[in-house]
Every structure is written in structure tokens, then in C-alpha cells.
From Swiss-Prot:
Prodomain positions: 23-38
The name this protein goes by in its record: Trypsin zeta
PROSITE patterns: TRYPSIN_DOM, TRYPSIN_HIS, TRYPSIN_SER
BP term (GO), one: proteolysis
Protein encoded by which gene: zetaTry
């Protein structure tokens, strides 16, 4: 058996893994859904309001004739570095992605398009708890032309947000469970929920692996619902005053009163991010 044939087979298997693990679906979790950044109860916004937001577009290895399609969101850290969710990129390779910045839409060729050259996924992803350490760093080339208007870097949080602080989540996707995705960039404002309360809310969700860890933070209108991130755009930003506090990760369905959205905790994961960047 030739080595080239083996490489081709491995690439095909990786592509299959990506379809099942890269974007978890409702049926994958026995009627437990994983928010991937779909905005529920939000409003149309302009990229100038969230200029750090990017569209991460994907194409399967076995379908090179297909166009790159929006898969996840992400945030610009600097001209060559994007922060996104680990579950967006697990089982895939860099050449399957392009990053589009400075656009209001998840389709089309407006905005600035660049290539993903390297993916660094947290080595502790899913260790100890479902979706634990759900973060990844993408390196792109050519560099993004930052302009402080539609393409702008965002600072990474160093401290935990205070409970009740209103945060902004942005992204593309459907506006209701099972609905159609939005081509227009959307945003929603949600208050931070303490990890203690969030863990109580998720106590009866799934098995014991679905718990809230220090590597996560929660946000949502607890007891009210109606506003949340959800399936369709994982990896997108949760920001407070133009500072990145969270990366859209998972949760139970969308905008339910007693199930806040769960995000990767940027402040807690900052040492890992800094170590990755220092290793360049």
C-alpha cells in the first residue's frame, strides 16, 4: 500500500471526524444542543460595532470543488492571530479554513479574506468535563490589515467579569432553535451569571461530565431567557467594553430561562494563550 494512498485515507477520516465533532449537533448529544454562536433574541448590528468579529469559513477535504462556507465565529487578537473554540476545529487541518474579517455577512466575498496557516488547539480540551478548555488559536497569513474601524483587534481579559455585568455576544446563525441562519451579523446583550449559579442550573443536564468548570463562564437572562447564543456560530466573542471575556462554547438548547449560555473563560485560559503566543 503506497504512502500517498494512506495519507489520502487519513485525510478522508479526519474530514468525517470533523463533521461529527467539529460542530456538535442536537442529535449528537441525545437532545442536548451545543450553542455555536447562533444569536437568539438579538438585533442586527454592523461590523463597525464589533470589528474584532470574524467569519471562519470551512471546506471539506473530500469536496475541493465546493466553496468555503461559514462554520464558526472568532475574534481578532492581532493581525495574525484569531481566537476561536476548540470544538470548531477539532479533527480538521488549517488548509480547510479561511478567515473573513470586516464583513457584515456570512456569505459573499466582501471583507478581507486570509488563509489559516496553523491551528493550535488546547491540549486539555474536553479533559475532566465536556467542552472543558474549549479554545483554539489560529494563525493567519497574509496578516489582516487592522484599521480601527471594521477590522480591529480586541484585548483579552485578565480578570473575571463581575456577576450581572452586561456583555455582548455577536455572530451569524439562526434566530430560533431549528430555524434558518441569518446572513446579517447579529448581536445580543446578556448579563454574566456566576459559575456557582450556572452549575446549579446545569445540575440536572446530561451526565456528570456536563458541569461548569473554572475554564468556563456563563451569561444569559437567568429565570427569563429569550436572549442567548446558540447553534450555528461557535467560537464567537463574548465581550465587555471591547474586551474579550468569553468564547461561545455550549449549553442546553437556546435562550432557555434556566440554562445560561456557556463560554470558554478567557481570563482563566489567558496563561495558555500567552504561552502559545510566546512559543512563536
Amino acid at each position: 500500500m503506497s504512502s500517498s494512498w494512506i495519507v489520502g485515507l487519513l485525510a478522508f477520516l479526519v474530514s468525517l471526524v470533523a463533521l461529527t465533532q467539529g460542530l456538535p449537533l442536537l442529535e449528537d448529544l441525545d437532545e442536548k444542543s451545543v450553542p455555536d454562536g447562533r444569536i437568539v433574541g438579538g438585533y442586527a448590528t454592523d461590523i463597525a460595532q464589533v470589528p474584532y468579529q470574524i467569519s471562519l469559513r470551512y471546506k471539506g477535504i473530500t469536496t475541493p470543488e465546493n466553496p468555503f462556507r461559514h462554520r464558526c465565529g472568532g475574534s481578532i487578537f492581532n493581525e495574525t492571530t484569531i481566537v476561536t473554540a476548540a470544538h470548531c476545529v477539532i479533527g480538521t487541518v488549517a488548509s480547510q479554513y479561511k478567515v473573513v474579517a470586516g464583513t457584515n455577512f456570512q456569505t459573499g466575498s466582501d471583507g478581507v479574506i486570509t488563509n489559516v496557516k496553523e491551528i493550535v488547539m488546547h491540549e486539555g480540551y474536553y479533559s475532566g468535563a465536556a467542552y472543558n478548555n474549549d479554545i483554539a488559536i489560529l494563525f493567519v497569513d497574509p496578516p489582516l490589515p487592522l484599521n480601527n474601524f471594521t477590522i480591529k483587534a480586541i484585548k483579552l481579559a485578565l480578570e473575571q467579569p463581575i456577576e450581572g455585568t452586561v456583555s455582548k455576544v455577536s455572530g451569524w446563525g439562526t434566530t430560533s432553535p431549528g430555524g434558518y441562519s441569518s446572513n446579517q451579523l447579529l448581536a445580543v446583550d446578556v448579563p454574566i451569571v456566576s459559575n456557582e449559579l450556572c452549575d446549579q442550573d446545569y445540575e440536572d443536564f446530561g451526565d456528570e461530565t456536563y458541569r461548569i468548570t473554572s475554564a468556563m463562564l456563563c451569561a444569559g437572562k437567568r429565570g427569563v431567557g429569550g436572549a442567548d447564543a446558540c447553534q450555528g456560530d461557535s467560537g464567537g466573542p463574548l465581550a465587555v467594553r471591547d474586551e474579550l471575556y468569553g468564547v461561545v462554547s455550549w449549553g442546553n438548547s437556546c435562550a432557555l430561562p434556566n440554562y445560561p449560555g456557556v463560554y470558554a473563560n478567557v481570563a482563566y485560559l489567558r496563561p495558555w494563550i500567552d504561552a502559545v503566543l510566546a512559543g512563536l
